[in-house]
């Protein structure tokens, strides 16, 4: 005859198998959903300074400041399998020293139950926009893109890029002002 521990082990193993199958079923129902939505980005102000970079050699580096607006309706992304979204605004540009530079300028976490409609006006960069040299001065093609990671309850962590981006030129001169 089977002991109590043997029966408990069988019940636990069966329950674990059923839970794994249900979790996989939950994942597969939303795995192929398109999570891209239109995004409107508008840059209202760009300022460029040449400052000492205290993180590396004692050379002067470009420091950019951007004021921007974001408009997006993220409601269609949220379903029963989405726990939260990690949004981030990144700048992508090339210089003579580096073919590709990518810098995260701003981020935000949108939880399930929060307002999924973004109407952000006159936002400033959350993180410093340093270039490792003088590659921002006069750069005519700095592209800002809003992207997000979908954090699901079950399944993979997809990286999605919004269907709107904006390319902005940086000024040819440095600002002398003390504040932003």
UniProtKB/Swiss-Prot annotation:
Domain of life: Eukaryota
Keyword Transmembrane: yes
Subcellular location: Endoplasmic reticulum membrane
InterPro entries: SPC3
Sequence ranges on the Lumenal membrane side: 33-180
Cytoplasmic topological intervals: 1-11
Glycan-linked positions: 141
Assigned keywords, A-Z: Endoplasmic reticulum, Glycoprotein, Membrane, Signal-anchor, Transmembrane, Transmembrane helix
Topology with respect to the bilayer: Single-pass type II membrane protein
GO biological process, one term: proteolysis
TM regions (residue ranges): 12-32
Cellular component annotations (GO), alphabetically ordered: endoplasmic reticulum; endoplasmic reticulum membrane; signal peptidase complex
Main subcellular location: endoplasmic reticulum
Family: Belongs to the SPCS3 family.
Subunit note: Component of the signal peptidase complex paralog A (SPC-A) composed of a catalytic subunit SEC11A and three accessory subunits SPCS1, SPCS2 and SPCS3. Component of the signal peptidase complex paralog C (SPC-C) composed of a catalytic subunit SEC11C and three accessory subunits SPCS1, SPCS2 and SPCS3. Within the complex, interacts with SEC11A or SEC11C and SPCS1. The complex induces a local thinning of the ER membrane which is used to measure the length of the signal peptide (SP) h-region of protein substrates.
Function as written in the Swiss-Prot or TrEMBL entry: Essential component of the signal peptidase complex (SPC) which catalyzes the cleavage of N-terminal signal sequences from nascent proteins as they are translocated into the lumen of the endoplasmic reticulum. Essential for the SPC catalytic activity, possibly by stabilizing and positioning the active center of the complex close to the lumenal surface. (Microbial infection) Plays an important role in virion production of flaviviruses such as West Nile virus, Japanese enchephalitis virus, Dengue virus type 2 and Yellow Fever virus.
Name of the protein in question: Signal peptidase complex subunit 3
Gene label: SPCS3
């Amino acid at each position: 005859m089977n002991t109590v521990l043997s029966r408990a082990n069988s019940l636990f193993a069966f329950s674990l198998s059923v839970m794994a199958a249900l979790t996989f079923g939950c994942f597969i129902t939303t795995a192929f959903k398109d999570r891209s939505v239109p995004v409107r980005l508008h840059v209202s102000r760009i300022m460029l300074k040449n400052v000492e970079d205290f993180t590396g050699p004692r050379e002067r580096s470009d420091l950019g400041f951007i004021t921007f607006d974001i408009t997006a309706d993220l409601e269609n992304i949220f379903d029963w399998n989405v726990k939260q979204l990690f949004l981030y605004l990144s700048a992508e540009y090339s210089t003579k020293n580096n073919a590709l530079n990518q810098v995260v300028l701003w981020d935000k976490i949108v939880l399930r139950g929060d307002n999924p409609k973004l109407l952000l006006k006159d936002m400033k960069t959350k993180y410093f926009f340093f270039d490792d040299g003088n590659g921002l001065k006069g750069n005519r093609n700095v592209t800002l893109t809003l992207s997000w990671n979908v954090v699901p309850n079950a399944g993979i962590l997809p990286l999605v890029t919004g269907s709107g981006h904006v390319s902005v030129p940086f000024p040819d001169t440095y600002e002398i002002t003390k504040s932003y």
